[in-house]
Amino acid sequence: MRIASKVLHRDQDGVSGFVAYPATAARRPGVLVLHHANGVTADLKTTAADLARLGYATLVPNLYHMLGVSGDSHIGRGAELQQRLNDNEFLRVIGDAWRFLARRADVDPTRTGIIAHSMGGRLSIPFAADTPELRALVLYYPSVRDEIETALRPRHAFDLARTIKCPSMLIYGGRDHIAGPETRRRLWESFHANGQPFEWHFYSHARHGFASPDSDGYQPEMASIVWPLVTDFLHRALVEPPLA
C-alpha cells in the first residue's frame, strides 16, 4: 500500500509530531502512538509507517514539544521532564493530539485506538478512562509504580483502569525494573475488573523497553514476537465490525 507521511509543527499544524497514512481518500481507523520517556524516536516513526501500510492513519505526537520543551532529541531526559511536567499537562496535549487525529477527513472518529510505550502507557490509562470513545488500547510495559498520588501524578492507574470502556492489551516482561510483580498483579486485577475484553501478554525473560532500540532493555527478538499480536488485536478492535 502506498503511504504518505509528514512532520508536524504545532505553530503550523496545531500539533507537533509525525503522521503517516495510506495515500487514498477512504476513511479508515486512526491510531495514536504515544512515546516513552525518550520522546519521539526513529523507531516510533517506523511504527507509524508500518501501521499506515496496514491501513491506519497514525499520529505520533511529540508531547514534549507540545508542552514547550525544545530540542530535537529528548533521549535520557525523561526522568527530569516528568519531574517538571505533571500528568494533567500531559493529558491535555494527548487530548489535543487525539482530537487532531479523530477530526482528520480520512479518519473514522468512531474507530480510534492507542499504542503506547512506558511513560506513554502510564499516561494512556487516565486518558482512556476519560475518553470512552476510544476503541482500543495497547500498552507496552506501562511505567506504573505502586506510589501515592501527588500533584505531579494525581490519579493512580490502579483505580482508573477499572473504569476503561474499550478492549485493552497489556504487555509486560518478568525482568521489568519499573513495574514489579505486585504492581503488575494489581494492574491486571484492575483491568480485569472493568468488564471489557482484555489481553495480558507476559514474557518472563523480557525487559522494560524491549521494543525500543534506544533503551538499555532492547530485545529485538521480543519486539518481533509481540508485533503480530499487536496488529491482530488492532484489527479485531478497530477494523472488524463489533459483535452483535
What is the meaning of each model-derived region?
Residues 177-183:
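Conserved alpha/beta-hydrolase "acid-adjacent" motif
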Residues 164, 170-172, 176:
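Short beta-strand/loop motif that positions the catalytic acidic residue
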Residues 5-107, 154, 209-214:
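Serine-hydrolase catalytic machinery in alpha/beta-hydrolase-like enzymes
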Residues 29, 111, 167:
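Alpha/beta-hydrolase fold active-site loops
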Residues 96-155, 159, 163:
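Primarily recognizes the serine-hydrolase "nucleophile elbow" in alpha/beta-hydrolase
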Residues 62, 115-117, 138-141, 171, ...:
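Alpha/beta-hydrolase-fold catalytic nucleophile elbow
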Residues 192-244:
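C-terminal catalytic histidine-bearing segment of alpha/beta-hydrolase fold enzymes
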Residues 67-71, 144-150, 178:
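A short beta-to-alpha transition loop/helix N-cap that caps and shapes the active-site region
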